[in-house]
Design a protein with these regions (language model features):
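Transmembrane alpha-helices and immediately adjacent membrane-cytoplasm interface residues
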Residues: 36-67
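"A position-specific structural signal for the A-helix of alpha-solenoid helical repeats
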Residues: 62, 93-100, 136-140, 144, ...
Length: 266
């Protein structure tokens, strides 16, 4: 991600120049042994490089947190999208950025734009994993659009990839994503699956963006399991996170439906 923040590179180069000047002074002015001087310069160079990389990673995470912690997809897009041009011909960086931007646009309800961004994803070295990530993202967008047939098609293809993956090329996060998507799709059809596992996922510590999504998933599963009280509690948690996220808005819709149903029964 360092390519996205050229000024961090400039600072790193200035620090490296300072290190070289210091090394020269140690050798010429103080008469320090050449071998020791070279060793000191090598260590200082590694520290400078590591510091530069950490600075860039920290800046990238800070921007991601606008979406993941602040739950503000519109502001995230305004900050993050201009960086896309700086990715240049670095396909892994492009893929990561397009996936996050697609997620942000989908949460604003701009589904066609979200799908277009996934279509722009470049080929990468770890193509199997990339294909799995993109299929999972596409499946979730179709669920958000309530186009369940298209979502099911994407998920069937993703599950086939998971089944065929004997070397863990997809990665554990993609495998778990496939499981969650199957649970969500089943719940949308009134089938409750993996209830205990979903409860454990929802109870795990997550950034607010993911926590809201997991609480919605739990609420939907409990609804399908005819546990209205439990569903209501989970949906209230999901809806309470923000109005900027699809998961929160969907939870509020389901909650309103539950309350309307309860009023009729009363």
């Amino acid at each position: 991600m360092i390519v996205l923040y050229p000024f961090v590179v400039v600072v790193g180069l200035l620090c490296e120049a300072a290190v070289l000047v210091l090394g020269s002074m140690l050798h010429t002015t103080l008469g320090l042994n050449l071998g020791i001087t070279v060793a000191i310069l090598a260590v200082a160079t590694l520290i400078t490089f590591a510091g530069t990389m950490l600075s860039a990673t920290g800046m990238h995470q800070k921007q991601l947190n606008i979406l993941l912690r602040d739950m503000d997809p519109e502001r995230f897009i305004s900050v993050y999208e201009p960086l896309l041009k700086k990715a240049g011909k670095r396909p892994n960086v492009q893929l990561t950025m397009l996936a996050y931007l697609s997620t942000a646009y989908a949460n604003l309800g701009q589904y066609e734009k979200a799908l277009e961004l996934l279509d722009e994803a470049p080929s990468v070295k770890e193509q199997v994993r990339a294909d799995g990530l993109l299929l999972g993202n596409r499946c979730l967008i179709y669920i958000q659009m309530n186009q369940l047939d298209k979502a099911a098609d994407c998920l069937t293809r993703l599950e086939a990839m998971v089944k065929a993956d004997k070397t863990n090329a997809l990665g554990g996060d993609v495998v778990q994503s496939a499981r969650c998507l199957r649970i969500r799709l089943n719940a949308s059809k009134g089938w409750a699956t993996d209830v205990a596992w979903v409860k454990a996922v929802a109870a795990s510590g997550q950034p607010p963006f993911y926590a809201a999504s997991n609480q919605l998933m739990l609420g939907q599963v409990l609804l399908a399991d005819h546990n209205k009280a439990g569903a209501k509690a989970s949906l209230e948690k999901a809806a309470g996170y923000s109005t900027n996220l699809w998961a929160c808005r969907r939870a509020a819709e389901l909650l309103a439906g539950l309350e309307a149903s309860a009023s009729k029964e009363a």
